[in-house]
Amino acid sequence: MIQPNNKPSLSIVILCYRSEEGIIGFIRQVEDELRIEGLEDYELVLVANYIAGQSDKTPDIVRQVASENPRAVPVIMEKHGGMGWDVISGFGAANGAVVALIDGDGQMPPKDIVRLWRVLKSGEFDFVKTFRKQRLDGSHRIFVSRWYNWLFHVLFPTSPYRDINSKPKLITRKALDQMQLHCSGWFLDGEIMLEVRRLNLSFAEVPTVFNNNEWRASFVNWKTALEMVSSMIEYRVHYWRE
């Protein structure tokens, strides 16, 4: 258990946006995997930011979870950005010596958090992530993802990473505190990877299986893909220096 005034070994930032009741089962799966591993010194940062006027039960569900679970840290604010804004707000609430980032929709297996934790705790790496060796989410999503990763490597040809948007991502606190993250939209994963490169962080990538989302439609479509590309090009032109 986390002792009063002590910081946890691991903070798990879970993006809960519009997950509603599905987030309850996902949290249970995460905690089951941590329990099997014998990892008790952790916190769950549950990011349930919302759009004003939009019907979404997730904030209330997360508040209820946090009232019953002392390891849960709720982050609930009216949204002033997209996915990146949620991630940055979650990072700001995380206190762990290691910070994990994962979506709460069940497509990324919770057991991967433990797999990456083991790799990171070896002390060899500052940053560890998955790459999706097998995908069960359909040909359309696979095509969009491959096209996006191809374009990323065209614009940033010396980037060695295999799968930019794959999660979980685990990073040491020291490395996270050095990152300059500003993207409020869908390119946040790309910005993280470019910061890994800028800071010359040691990293590892571990293969995983990416599941189909059984209980809600994905938020990733051609519109979000184009937003990611626009942000990628803007980053290439205005911010990145080889």
Residue ranges and their predicted role:
Residues 19-23, 54, 109:
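Donor nucleotide-sugar binding loop of glycosyltransferases
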Residues 99:
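Short aromatic/hydrophobic "clamp" motif used to bind/position activated sugar donors
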Residues 19-35:
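Short, well-formed alpha-helical segments that are part of the catalytic scaffolds
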Residues 8-14, 23, 30, 42-47:
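Hydrophobic targeting segments
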Residues 1-10, 19-21, 158, 181-242:
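Hydrophobic helical membrane-anchoring modules
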Residues 30-75:
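Acidic donor-binding segment of Leloir-type glycosyltransferases
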Residues 71, 78-93, 110-186, 213-223, ...:
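Acceptor/aglycone-binding surface of glycosyltransferases and processive sugar-polymer synthases
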Residues 103-107:
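The conserved acidic donor/metal-binding loop of glycosyltransferases
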